[in-house]
């Protein structure tokens, strides 16, 4: 029995399912989840001491790689001065100024402790600002586990949605409309019928929770247009894409400006953090400036703020993003070439340093239905084949992969060598 198997049995005694977030349990791919003990740069080591090249990167935050020495030293120094104050610090103001200088349309920002808190608070704020209740989200997008967002589509575009988890009151579905991602026509039809009731649209500009699915040309522009026309708030959930796809997030990459942006992951440098920010007239409605309540004991945590500031400082180096783009291009193009050579139906998507791949006959994957139709059993075999060869990919076919600045040419070569062997066995 491996050490991971032993630890998983032990964990299940006191942790539901043995994990603290469902995807970690390997339910999607089968087998025992790998328990990890340490990570450095592009590598992560399991409890038995086996090293893997890591393309999960803690689900996106580690754009500089694991345990970057400058970030680690900054965290140690900050921790020596106190782990939490529950009071204002200069550091949170400095990070707020930095975010507002980099993110399009962000005049003010409020820090929280997770992406879920950020999206939940952004929706509450949008509802208060517009004095409306209905929200639009998209099938396949994930915005955390708050009740209003755990709603899946009904039987038709404008039918009521239904909760996607027990414990979510059905009445919340009355206010949540779930549409097809990348379907601009459907969005326009929905607004034509219900526009005066819609408080906001919330969307992942690049969907990282049905693998990696970019917006088709004109889709984000359509969202901006209908929100402007009907007085609704456009919320871009950049928890995953913020400082991951470009130095100014997906908004800078695609030239779209949100009314409210949610952030997380990279802005904490690996520490727990989230944020939501946007137009001054909207953000000033948050307490204590305005009537919309939001609070948190650990919001603006000084250690997390220090890690975030150092990470963003390092990301300003001009060579960072071109390097990330080149490495990501090399990986996905290499995978496509190898799959084609092996005669495996396969296609890839990537934006910046996010990437995804699909076992499908489709030439381009742009929506949730296509993702659901992919060959998941074949993905699972590929995942385990790569894992055996020391390559750690996301343990689910619906999750994006991530490149870091720490990945080397040797890492890419080793990954493609492993992929060639696995493709030949499928």
From Swiss-Prot:
SUPFAM superfamilies hit by this protein: PLP-dependent transferases
Give the top-level enzyme category: isomerase
Q: Please give the cofactor(s) recorded in the UniProt entry for this protein.
A: pyridoxal 5'-phosphate
UniProt signal peptide: none
What the entry lists under PROSITE patterns is as follows: AA_TRANSFER_CLASS_3 (PS00600)
Catalytic activities = (S)-4-amino-5-oxopentanoate = 5-aminolevulinate
The EC number on file is 5.4.3.8
- List keywords of the entry alphabetically: Cytoplasm, Isomerase, Porphyrin biosynthesis, Pyridoxal phosphate
Q: What's the superkingdom here?
A: Bacteria
Identify the pathway: Porphyrin-containing compound metabolism; protoporphyrin-IX biosynthesis; 5-aminolevulinate from L-glutamyl-tRNA(Glu): step 2/2
Q: Which InterPro entries match?
A: 4pyrrol_synth_GluAld_NH2Trfase, Aminotrans_3, Aminotrans_3_PPA_site, PyrdxlP-dep_Trfase, PyrdxlP-dep_Trfase_major, PyrdxlP-dep_Trfase_small
Q: Which residues in this protein are found as N6-(pyridoxal phosphate)lysine?
A: 265
One Pfam match: Aminotran_3
Q: Where in the cell is it found?
A: Cytoplasm
Q: Name one GO cellular component term.
A: cytoplasm
Any GO molecular function: pyridoxal phosphate binding
Q: Main subcellular localization, coarse class?
A: cytoplasm
Cite the Gene3D superfamilies for this sequence: Aspartate Aminotransferase, domain 1 (3.90.1150.10), Type I PLP-dependent aspartate aminotransferase-like (Major domain) (3.40.640.10)
Q: Can you supply a Gene Ontology BP term from the record?
A: protoporphyrinogen IX biosynthetic process
- Family the UniProt entry places it in: Belongs to the class-III pyridoxal-phosphate-dependent aminotransferase family. HemL subfamily.
What binding partners and quaternary form does the record give? Homodimer.
HAMAP family with a match to the protein in the record: HemL_aminotrans_3 (MF_00375)
Name assigned to this protein: Glutamate-1-semialdehyde 2,1-aminomutase
